[in-house]
Design a protein with these regions (language model features):
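Conserved small-residue motifs centered on glycine
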Residues: 35-36, 340, 344-464
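Bacterial N-terminal signal peptides
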Residues: 8-17
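Glycine-rich, aromatic-lined ligand/substrate-binding cores of catalytic
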Residues: 249-253, 269-288, 296-299, 306-391
Length: 498
């Protein structure tokens, strides 16, 4: 930690200009920073920026947007070159905005500065070439920097382990074994309330059900695509998808799937009474707390990906990289100073300062290496996080470290992290993050609007039996995909995957 701070101070001292001072004796800002954050954050008074100024002697004038629509409009003005700031922070730049602003000369290529002025970030990018690829335009430039989160974040299979225990069942490891477990959940009164009120498996829509497709080797993204060994393909027309949908129809017919799954939402299925009997055997969600009271969290554990053909694979929904969090415009003088400034957020010390604040002020370390907040959780939520950190709100550049969060004293939080990590070794990003040309992006949007809603509707009909799965109906389904441009979609994406 000391070495990171010392290095940062040394670099900035070499680059530091004479400090300008306003007439009132107030420090004049060195750079103009602009970006988006939630209304609970005020960059002018946030202790993170104050502490960073003490460390780096860089002061900012802030233009903070707290309204998402207003920031979207402002980004359009920036793209046209109107009243440019020096730095965009928590910028939420889309791939298209990054591409277009870079092409217009609005954004500075940051890659030439990284090895010398951002060695910690550069080391991360060298260790993970896919991270570097994700922020690199086709011309080789990198006008934006990422947020890199080591924390697990995915739509997972949360199974009621208390029910498994009540019914003396083992964790299922295949689709067939899961079917047997769901039948036991339906028949065995596992919540012990004497009523047949159990919902063996709850979900929201075909989008969420598709995460079960891994049990048949399927892990397509929202474009229904995946890439293996540089070849882009779709699982939609495969025999595996037909087998998957046939299995789902079986679950539906046996009332093992939530009958409201195609029409409900979290607010409608959520159990708010802490004393109520829990009706859900398995929940497809990023967390059970979206459906059950926090007190019931301990009943659930993550079901590891089911085996298919002797292998386990699961879709990684988001991946570790969020692009477009930080950029410098052509107005920025001495960009190397801000590259050194932001590099600190990719160090251990900088990550903690951004995410949890300063040791001794916002949190403390125990002798055993665990940590806890100095204040109660209500104060943490209402004061510490919004006023002393970059946590929440817009996504900031930097790294969010898993190891530190695993040492939090709250066992509910660390237990949930441990559960979510169970599937990580099997997760795979279906497609790499790339930058599309404007022409290809437009065409893909057109094709997606034809393919995705229709495909989801047809698959849902297969599940519910509204459309029986026969050779004729399956041929019609695959023909419908082809007529809507699935092969063209694959061909466009293939140009960007090697």
């Amino acid at each position: 930690m000391r070495r990171a701070t010392a290095w940062l101070a040394a670099v900035l001292m070499l680059l530091m200009p004479l400090t300008a001072v306003a007439e009132e004796g107030q420090r004049a800002p060195d750079y103009l920073m602009e970006g988006y954050d939630e209304a609970t954050h005020d960059w002018e008074t946030n202790r993170f920026f104050q502490r960073m100024q003490e460390k780096t002697d860089i002061a900012f004038e802030f233009r903070e947007y707290t309204d998402a629509e207003a920031w979207a409009g402002r980004k359009k003005a920036i793209a046209s070159g109107e009243d440019l700031p020096d730095v965009l922070f928590k910028a939420q730049l889309t791939a298209a905005e990054t591409r277009d602003m870079a092409a217009a000369g609005i954004l500075t290529d940051l890659k030439p500065y990284l090895a010398e002025y951002a060695p910690d970030l550069w080391q991360l990018l060298q260790a993970h070439p896919d991270y570097l690829e994700a922020i690199t335009l086709p011309d080789g430039s990198s006008p934006v920097l990422p947020s890199i989160s080591e924390l697990p974040n995915n739509d997972l299979m949360w199974i009621n382990t208390a029910w498994l225990k009540n019914l003396h069942l083992e964790m299922p490891s295949t689709a067939d074994e899961l079917t047997e477990v769901l039948r036991a959940f339906r028949n065995g009164d596992p919540n012990r309330n004497g009523k047949a009120d159990e919902v063996p498996l709850t979900f929201i829509g075909m989008w969420e059900l598709r995460f079960l497709g891994h049990a048949f080797g399927l892990y397509d993204n929202d474009y229904y695509l995946h890439a293996e060994d540089g070849v882009v393909s779709s699982g939609l027309r495969t025999d595996e998808n037909r087998q998957f949908l046939t299995w789902l129809h079986q679950l539906w017919e046996e009332k093992l799937l939530d009958r409201q799954g195609f029409s409900t939402m979290d607010t409608l299925r959520q159990i708010t009474d802490a004393n109520a009997a829990i009706p859900y055997g398995m929940i497809l969600s990023n967390s059970p707390v979206t459906v059950v009271p926090s007190g019931a969290m301990s009943q659930y554990g993550v079901l590891a990906p089911l085996k298919w053909d002797g292998k386990q694979i699961y879709r990684d929904l988001l991946g570790p990289v969020t692009r477009g969090t930080f950029a410098l415009t052509k107005n920025c003088q001495k960009p190397e100073r801000l590259i050194a400034w932001v590099n600190f957020l990719y160090t251990h010390e900088g990550s903690l300062l951004a995410q949890v604040g300063q040791e001794g002020d916002e949190y403390f370390l125990n002798e055993d290496g665990t940590w806890d907040w100095m204040a109660d959780l209500e104060t943490v939520a209402n004061d510490v996080l919004p006023n002393s950190t970059l946590a929440d709100g817009g996504v900031a550049p930097g790294v969010i470290e898993l190891a530190f969060q695993q040492k939090y004293t709250d066992t509910t939080t660390t237990g949930m992290i441990a559960e979510m990590l169970k599937s990580r070794e099997f997760t795979r990003m279906p497609m790499p993050l790339v930058f599309l040309s404007a022409e290809d992006e437009k065409r893909i949007a057109e094709l997606q609007s034809r393919i995705a809603p229709w495909a989801e509707q047809q698959m849902a009909a297969f599940v519910t039996g509204d459309t029986p799965i026969t050779d004729e109906s399956w041929t019609a389904f695959t023909a419908g995909l082809e007529s809507r441009g699935l092969d063209e979609m694959i061909g466009i994406w293939q140009k960007y995957v090697h």
